[in-house]
Amino acid sequence: PIETHAMVDACIEAFNISGEKKWVDNAVMCFNWFLGHNDLNMVLYDPKSGGCRDGLMADGINQNEGAESTLACLLSHLTLQKHYADQTLKKAAP
């Protein structure tokens, strides 16, 4: 999860520098890893607890929901939300 968060941040920063939409698409693709678009097709984010599983293993997901993984998931989500809010404000600006 930590690496996924780093990739989301890096992709959004690449968009901020280049303006190329492909970087936003890549950030969303990275975030979707938490939601089951991963090698095991298993969801790591648990909406009931608000936590995130600690990672993928050969035989499934690590059921622990550590603070580091949860923060990685939630901060990735906030990064995308902020990006979309910033873009909405830019479009609304005179």
Language-model features: where?
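Glycan-recognition and catalytic cores of secretory/periplasmic carbohydrate-active enzymes
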Residues: 1-94
